């Protein structure tokens, strides 16, 4: 059937990424510019429907492939059934998540014969683009400035004390409009203050304990950005108390 037809057989990293980008553009249009048309086509009264993105940048709502196993990995089945049981934005977000998964599965199906470095390069190219979920939900993704576990102590400490987004060279950049400049908050969004339990926000100064690696609001532990610069190794109040008991 048309939905399962493959118009190309990409083999190199560049060809596979081009295929990914075209399919992604198609799905993105269905979920944004053509969203009213897409929404109306996903009638819950119809049979199991899938959203397909094709290499020619066209999208299609259709029944799944009849052959088993299908020629390509299939997108999520029955996206139409949940349409009227959810808020529109939540349903579109759900479709976007499943569509992101499908795009990856198709790309790595084509990339089955790639070697390790080629797969890594392919994923890097894909990862540089915002996901459909990012775009549909308006979620801002920000750069990963969280230090790796094997980074040097100076760099690690400097970064940990610089989450206030000020002008030090090791600090994260302030939020900007482009996707490439907006990935830090996504990384730290689930971080909770070890004192008050509040969520991380980019507007406040945070500091990380070098012993237990918990994060704290500077105001909760009475540490200012200026004071943090003079501390070689920061220990949070619980760690200081623990050492005192020992």
Curated annotation (Swiss-Prot):
ZnF locations on chain (PHD-type): 190-242
Gene Ontology BP terms: chromatin organization; regulation of DNA-templated transcription
Composition skew (Acidic residues), residue ranges: 177-188
Site (Histone H3K4me3 binding) residue list: 200, 206, 210, 215
InterPro entries from the UniProt entry: Alfin, Alfin_N, PHD_AL_plant, Zinc_finger_PHD-type_CS, Znf_FYVE_PHD, Znf_PHD, Znf_PHD-finger, Znf_RING/FYVE/PHD
Region of interest called Disordered, as start-end residue ranges on this chain: 140-190
GO molecular function: histone binding; zinc ion binding
N-acetylalanine modifications at: 2
Matches recorded under SMART domains: PHD
Alphabetized UniProt keyword annotations: Acetylation, Chromatin regulator, Metal-binding, Nucleus, Transcription, Transcription regulation, Zinc, Zinc-finger
Modified residues (N-acetylmethionine): 1
Subcellular location as annotated: Nucleus
Entry's Gene Ontology cellular component terms: nucleus
Known tissue expression: Ubiquitously expressed.
Domain text: The PHD-type zinc finger mediates the binding to H3K4me3.
Family in the record: Belongs to the Alfin family.
Function: Histone-binding component that specifically recognizes H3 tails trimethylated on 'Lys-4' (H3K4me3), which mark transcription start sites of virtually all active genes.
Subunit structure: Interacts with H3K4me3 and to a lesser extent with H3K4me2.
Protein name (record): PHD finger protein ALFIN-LIKE 2
Lineage: Eukaryota, Viridiplantae, Streptophyta, Embryophyta, Tracheophyta
């Amino acid at each position: 059937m048309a939905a399962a037809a493959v118009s190309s057989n990409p083999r190199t990293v560049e060809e596979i990424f081009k295929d990914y980008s075209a399919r992604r553009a198609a799905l993105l249009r269905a979920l944004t510019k053509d969203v009213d048309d897409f929404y109306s086509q996903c009638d819950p009264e119809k049979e199991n429907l899938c959203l397909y993105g094709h290499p020619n940048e066209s999208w299609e709502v259709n029944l799944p492939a009849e052959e088993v196993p299908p020629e390509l990995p299939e997108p999520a089945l029955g996206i139409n059934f949940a349409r009227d049981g959810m808020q529109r934005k939540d349903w579109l977000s759900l479709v976007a998540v499943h569509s992101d998964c499908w795009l990856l599965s198709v790309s790595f199906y084509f990339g089955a014969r790639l070697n390790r470095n080629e797969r890594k390069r392919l994923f890097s190219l894909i990862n540089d683009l915002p996901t459909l979920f990012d775009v549909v939900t308006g979620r801002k993704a920000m750069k990963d400035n969280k230090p790796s576990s094997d980074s040097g102590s100076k760099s690690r400490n400097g970064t940990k004390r610089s989450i206030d987004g000020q002008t030090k060279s090791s600090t994260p950049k302030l939020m900007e409009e482009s996707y490439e400049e907006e990935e830090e908050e996504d990384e730290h969004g689930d971080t909770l203050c070890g004192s008050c339990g509040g969520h991380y926000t980019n507007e406040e100064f945070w500091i990380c304990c070098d012993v237990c690696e918990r994060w704290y609001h500077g105001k909760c532990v009475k540490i200012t950005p200026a004071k943090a610069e003079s501390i070689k190794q920061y220990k949070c109040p619980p760690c200081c108390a623990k050492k005192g008991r020992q």
